[in-house]
Amino acid sequence: MNYFSLIKKTVNLLNVVNLKKYSINSNMYFVNRESCIKNNKFKKILLYFPNQEFMHFGDHLFFEPLAKFLKETGFIVKIMPIKTMEFYFINNGYDIGKDNDILDADLLITRVEMYNEVIKFKKNTLFIDIASSNIKHYLCQDIVNKVADFLLVDAKSFYAKPSKINNYHGKIELNPDIEYITFNNYIDSGFYRVRKKHYKHLSDYCKHFAKINNLSVIHIGTKKDKEKDKNYYDFVDLDLRGETSAADLFYIASLDNVKYNISFDAFIMHIFFLYNKKSFILFRGRYTKEARNFVKQYLNPPFKPEPEIKIENIVEYI
């Protein structure tokens, strides 16, 4: 996300003010553009998130449990994610929506940041603010519970944890006799809160941790990250920057000999959460205490860990 995108996101967030009159709870807004359809008559639901300026990789994971719940409850569900995350939903058995599904849907579900884009469709739309400090539960469960209340269906027994991907190997081959740690020192969203000292601390921590635990370091990042980064990392054993897809990251995290992750609070962290593996996180921070508390309590991780998993076993801030 560049500064222009950041400005656009800020402007779109101001639309929350315009949405206040449509509020149905502390962070959701329903705009009824087709009054002949009542809440409990919705059948076809489209989760609409194709704009990569406002929908990052990890954001999709927050909404997958909702899609699963709606599908299990009997709704006809389609999803329009960003192109590079279509694989995730296809792998988990969802139908990918097309442009004609926008008109065909009884209800659109999207983020408040997409207000200006979605309001033009003149459809029944449920806007969700997933960054609201009013959220007081794990984000995935909060989304499911509140949407269920809106649709007049019961979600009390539903456990909202994002799905992994299945039966995917990809092109990455790791030595099964070596134990690894992934290292990702790049950031998109929230880059303006990160300074040189933060990057140095992340690198120094990884170098030290890998050495004392006899771990080989896998450097993760995009091709663009690698081209822009002129630093030399003498502790990296396997440089996979520019060589991994999002699906590859799921595969790497699933391997028994990949033990830990060191990164900012970003997409790869959320993948490791799914496999109950520990991430050492350099927190990007937030501007208010309420926002910081929300992220640490209900977003990292965005789901309630299984009873046998302690929070400190999957996330530690460095």
Model-derived features: positions:
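Structural motif
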Residues: L107, Y180, Y260-I262
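N-terminal pre-catalytic "stem/leader" segment of glycosyltransferase-like enzymes
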Residues: M1-I96
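Donor-binding and catalytic core of enzymes assembling or modifying cell-surface/extracellular glycoconjugates
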Residues: H201-K289
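Secretory-pathway glycan-assembly enzymes, especially type II membrane glycosyltransferases
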Residues: F69-A155
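Conserved catalytic-core segment of nucleotide-activated headgroup transferases in glycan assembly
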Residues: M55-L66, T73, D188-H219
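Extended, non-globular alpha-helical segments
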Residues: L19, S23-N27, N32-N39, G221-S245, ...
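A nucleotide-sugar donor-handling region in carbohydrate enzymes
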Residues: D129-T182, I187
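Charged active-site motifs of nucleotide-sugar-dependent glycosyltransferases
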Residues: K44-L46, P176-T182, L215-S216
